[in-house]
Amino acid sequence: MSVRIAIIGDLNPSSASHQELEAARAVLGPDVETVWIGTTDPRIDRLAEMGIDGVWLAPGSPYADDAAVLRAIRWAREHGIPFLGTCGGLQYAVIEFSRTVLGWHATHAEVDGVGATNAVAPLACS
C-alpha cells in the first residue's frame, strides 16, 4: 500500500528548506509518493480526486495564492487528512482555523500589516 503526499508551496530552488524537501523525496522509497503542487496550480483544488493521503504545506510564505492555500488546509482539516505545516505552513493553518472554526477576521501581520486582527505577528525568522 502506497501513501500519496501533496507538498504544497511555491518551489524555490534556492531555498535551503525546499532543497532538503527535494532530497527527502529521493529517499522515501517506493511506498511513499510525493507530488509538489504550486499554490497557483489548479490541482490544489483537486486533492481528493488525486487520492492525496496527507498534506505538507512547505515553508515559503507569503504564498503566490493565499486563498488556494487556505482552501487546501481547510480541505485537509475537514476530511481528516493528516496535515503538516512548517514555518509559514503552520502560520497559515492558524489563520485558516481562526477564520473558519472560530469565526475571527484573522489576519497575518507579514501579509496584511500589523493590526488588531493579527492571529500571526511578525516573526524574527521571516
Where in this protein do the model-derived segments appear?
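N-terminal beta1-alpha1 cap of cysteine-dependent amidohydrolase-like domains
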Residues: 1-126
